Swiss-Prot record:
Biological process terms in GO annotation: tRNA thio-modification
Misc. remarks from the entry: The thiolation reaction likely consists of two steps: a first activation step by ATP to form an adenylated intermediate of the target base of tRNA, and a second nucleophilic substitution step of the sulfur (S) atom supplied by the hydrosulfide attached to the Fe-S cluster.
Subunit structure comment from the entry: Homodimer.
Protein name (database record): tRNA-cytidine(32) 2-sulfurtransferase
Gene: ttcA
Motif (PP-loop motif): 54-59
Length: 315
């Protein structure tokens, strides 16, 4: 027995199991992020990616994963972390600079007192989130220009995408979600969501594993959007009672069949006529819908964009 063996601390069975589960979680999140980046061609050679960091679990995880992938990527790209200090009361201004300095990642803290603007404009008791979000978005677009960023990375995850889909469906009468990649309204910025394939439960576990210095998200005193909270509870209930159901809905977003919906802008129902030729996928009008919640839908589908350059795989 060597001296190193004697000095090495002996892990308990519980510690070994926790270490194993932590490694497995880290690899899974890296793998799913890699898949999203590849499927939607989110990051390309020479990109300068502005990683929007709020101090919450999702954006911390996004930065951590992207930094790991940056080392394994088959091409070069830059990361710069950006936080917007909106001067909310009690915001701990030292936490993020200290954390980012310890990582050695380039970062920029933008200070803009949007809190005072929102509280002055809105009546007392009104939800601040919508106006605050619009102000924040405009500032981040400006900062992206100033920093020369070619991509803006946001930390929205699978549950955020599902929540937006259901909010639009239930309260807006639209089949509209939250895309993994988009161009801003002014046509100048590409916004990406690298965590699109990751469930919130995994991000909660990852934050606990990594012990991120989380900053509370309710410092402004605004109440959480009750409708979004409602659909979030619904998805969480599904995950508990019907494993696979929420993934089925999520996967449906990339398996759209316009001929079997009702949008005349997506399919020419008006001009539809028999062609006299058989169509294997055409006559399913009387098929029974699949109702098995437990089908194999525990993760996003592969191969959405296989021609794209892929990152080194995590086994």
């Amino acid at each position: 027995m060597t001296r190193t063996d004697i000095e090495r601390p002996v892990r308990t069975q519980a510690e070994e199991k926790a270490r194993y589960e932590g490694n497995k979680l880290s690899k899974r999140l890296a793998r799913e992020t890699t898949r999203a980046l590849s499927d939607y061609n989110m990051i390309e050679e020479g990109d300068r990616v502005m990683v929007c960091l709020s101090g919450g679990k999702d954006s911390y995880a996004m930065l951590d994963i992207l930094m790991a992938l940056q080392k394994r990527a088959p091409f070069r790209f830059e990361l710069i972390a950006v936080n917007l200090d909106q001067k909310q009361p009690g915001f701990p201004a030292d936490i993020l600079p200290n954390y980012l300095s310890s990582l050695g990642v380039p970062f920029h803290i933008e200070t803009q007192d949007t809190y005072s603007i929102v509280t002055r404009v809105l009546a007392e008791g009104k939800t601040m989130c919508s106006l605050c979000s619009r102000l924040r978005r405009g500032i981040l677009y400006r900062v992206a220009d100033e920093l020369g960023a070619t991509k803006i990375a946001l930390g929205h995850h699978r549950d955020d995408i599902l929540g937006t889909l259901f909010l639009n469906l239930f309260y807006g009468g639209k089949l509209k979600g939250m895309p993994p990649k988009l161009v801003s309204d002014d046509g100048r910025h590409t916004v990406i969501r690298p965590l699109a394939y990751i469930a919130e439960t995994d991000l909660i576990a990852y934050a606990e594993l990594k012990q991120f210095p989380i900053i509370p998200c309710n410092l402004c005193g605004s109440q959480e959007n009750l409708k979004r909270k409602e659909v979030s509870r619904m998805v969480q209930e599904w995950d508990r009672k019907f494993p696979g159901r929420s993934w089925n809905v999520f996967n449906a977003l990339s398996r759209v069949v316009p001929s079997h919906l009702m949008d005349r802008d997506l399919f020419d129902f008006v001009g539809l006529k028999p062609t006299g030729l058989p169509d294997a996928n055409g006559d399913i009008a009387f098929d029974e819908p699949q109702t098995d919640d437990a089908c194999d839908a525990s993760a996003p589908t592969d191969g959405l964009n296989e021609q794209q350059i892929v990152f080194s795989r995590f086994s």
